[in-house]
């Protein structure tokens, strides 16, 4: 854990998943105060939203400094996103690859919408720094996770709201193994164990089966990425 490099408040996109939990720790190590926002858009794995409370309790237990920095946790319902999307994340259909090379778990515009709503909330609360877990190093190919997309959106929302926002993506160039390592660097074994036990990644919302990397079906693309990253992390660290 390090001293904050900023006396400002950050807003973290916090879904209850591995990546967003790691980003929350990253923000807590760098900002004086941190607020969170999560989105309920009719996702099949909405159980991840329920994981946030236990994760936050765990963060407070790991560090009294982190506990003192944790601010409001917001939840925003966006049912319209599910209504206009026809994907395996919002419909009870089998996960498969599409003809365009993208898995049918891709929700068009999801991160663009999330970040725009986050910026609108940040504007109202006087926050300029927004943190998201987007990554194009070890991911499913979603175009709204790419670095150039995030940079373009940062410019657009800054212009559109006449406010200089900064979109931080600390995982952008890290693979999943490096994301596990970052969690360890930030909060030690306690944070790694917290993320394993209480974060949620599985697209199917499965929490009945426990693996060494956490809970999930073990078969969907999200579980596969998380499991592979865990194995590589354990190999690298011995």
UniProtKB/Swiss-Prot annotation:
Taxonomic lineage from the root: Bacteria, Pseudomonadati, Pseudomonadota, Alphaproteobacteria, Hyphomicrobiales
Enzyme type, top EC level: ligase
Binding site for ATP: 14-24
Family: Belongs to the QueC family.
Record keywords, A-Z: ATP-binding, Ligase, Metal-binding, Nucleotide-binding, Queuosine biosynthesis, Zinc
Domain of life: Bacteria
Protein name per its UniProtKB record: 7-cyano-7-deazaguanine synthase 1
InterPro entries: QueC, Rossmann-like_a/b/a_fold
Function statement: Catalyzes the ATP-dependent conversion of 7-carboxy-7-deazaguanine (CDG) to 7-cyano-7-deazaguanine (preQ(0)).
Needed cofactors: Zn(2+)
Gene: queC1
Binding-site list for Zn(2+): 202, 217, 220, 223
Gene3D superfamilies (UniProt xref): HUPs
């Amino acid at each position: 854990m390090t001293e904050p490099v900023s006396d400002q408040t950050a807003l973290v996109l916090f879904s209850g998943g591995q990546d967003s939990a790691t980003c929350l720790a990253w923000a807590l190590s760098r900002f004086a105060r941190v607020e969170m926002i999560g989105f309920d858009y009719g996702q099949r794995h909405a159980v991840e939203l329920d994981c946030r409370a236990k994760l936050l309790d765990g963060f407070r237990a790991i560090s009294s400094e982190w506990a003192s920095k944790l601010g409001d946790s917001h939840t925003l319902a966006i049912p319209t996103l599910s209504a206009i999307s026809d994907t395996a994340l919002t419909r009870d259909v089998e996960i498969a690859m599409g003809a365009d090379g993208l898995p049918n778990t891709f929700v068009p515009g999801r991160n663009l919408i999330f970040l725009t709503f986050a910026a609108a909330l940040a504007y109202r609360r006087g926050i300029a720094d927004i943190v998201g877990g987007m990554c194009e190093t070890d991911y499913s190919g979603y175009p709204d996770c790419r670095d150039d997309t995030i940079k373009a959106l940062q410019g657009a929302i800054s212009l559109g709201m006449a406010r200089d926002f900064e979109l931080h993506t600390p995982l952008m160039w890290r693979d999943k193994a490096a994301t596990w390592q970052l969690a360890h660097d930030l909060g030690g074994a306690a944070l790694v164990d917290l993320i394993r036990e209480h974060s949620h990644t599985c697209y199917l919302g499965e929490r009945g089966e426990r693996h060494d990397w956490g809970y999930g079906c073990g078969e969907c693309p999200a579980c596969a990425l998380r499991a592979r990253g865990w194995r590589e992390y354990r190999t690298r660290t011995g």
